[in-house]
A protein has these predicted regions:
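Conserved beta/loop motifs at nucleotide-recognition and modification sites
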Residues: 1-148
């Protein structure tokens, strides 16, 4: 399901999905969308959050380890992937995580604006099927007064 950041609160009231991909040019809107998802997840019992920064040297096995690690303090957790670049060949790791379908874990993927190639990639399509793609486009000059 594709939604814009300004419609996210309505979607979150309806249901909390197992995966969210939040992307966009406007860092503040991306951050606010992430905060909304985290807040709703916290209210639903997702008390733990693990943040993984995925840059060029990221070991994708870390995602598997986090998914299989048991927590001493919380039953439910959010795994947040902050993508620094394009996970072109490693999108398979995200697909494998999604296929696990653990109701006690949620995946929050945060990245910059997705180009057409990435929007058509298998891992993004899988997220679109199982969760939501939240787009936070740049604020136009006409929208700026409302934005401020």
């Amino acid at each position: 399901m594709k939604i814009f950041a300004d419609k996210l609160s309505v979607t979150l009231r309806e249901a909390l999905l197992p995966v969210y991909l939040i992307s966009g040019d406007e860092p503040l809107l991306v951050q606010e969308a992430c905060d909304s998802v985290r807040s709703t997840a916290r209210a639903a019992g997702f008390a733990e959050r693990e943040v993984l920064h995925c840059d060029a040297g990221f070991n994708w096995d870390t995602l598997y380890h986090e998914a299989s690690a048991l927590s001493l303090f919380a039953n439910r957790k959010i795994i947040e992937l902050r993508l620094g670049g394009k996970p072109t060949d490693k999108g398979e790791a995200i697909i494998e995580w999604l296929e696990r379908k653990d109701p006690d874990q949620m995946l929050l993927v945060v990245t910059g604006k997705l180009d057409k190639t990435l929007l058509n990639s298998a891992w993004v399509k899988k997220i679109d099927t199982l969760g939501a793609i939240v787009q936070a486009p740049a604020v136009s000059a006409a929208q700026m007064p409302r934005f401020i």
